[in-house]
Amino acid sequence: HYMGARVPDDAIAVMPNHFNLHGLNDYPEQFYPADLVTYAVSRGWYKPAKDGDFSDFDFAKAYQAEDEFFGPRNVMRQKNGLRIALDRPWSVEKEGMPFCIRANRPVTPQMMAEILSSHYEGTRDCCAHFGPGLSPHDASSIRYICTGTTLESDLFILRDDPKLTTVMSSFGRPCQLPYVALPPLLAQ
């Protein structure tokens, strides 16, 4: 069982290894199987507040492991990704953990590179006390966006004609290596 949605053209999604789709009708192009809710009920993952009324159904809460729903590691990733994307602090307590948000400025490859290479520098979440010879990739208790298990990072610049899509790859950790633009693979 699954749920998916298309990110609207004027929005940005920050998806940090946890479910962040919630209601059944949150987005115009949203997809899920017909038995999504009844399956969750049958498994004991969801009980409607009022019998037969599924308006309080939350996919992320029902289908995600209980200790992962609003888990600190993933909350920090989404919060800090949104902070960079919006150029303002993001309050999980007040603004939640949405699937996507309306972008308040153009999304650029530079902005995406900054998000994907982030160790939360300059915030309370930054673990700047690594010590001599250590790096943020050695932090075991904090899962940064760019972390110890990040092997490479890719950006895709989508075009109306899919054949003209440009791929940019860091070919390693994005905080250590620059993104290299690869020309459109099927350009004529």
Predicted regions and their residues:
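C-terminus-biased signal that marks the final domain/tail of proteins
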Residues: 2-188
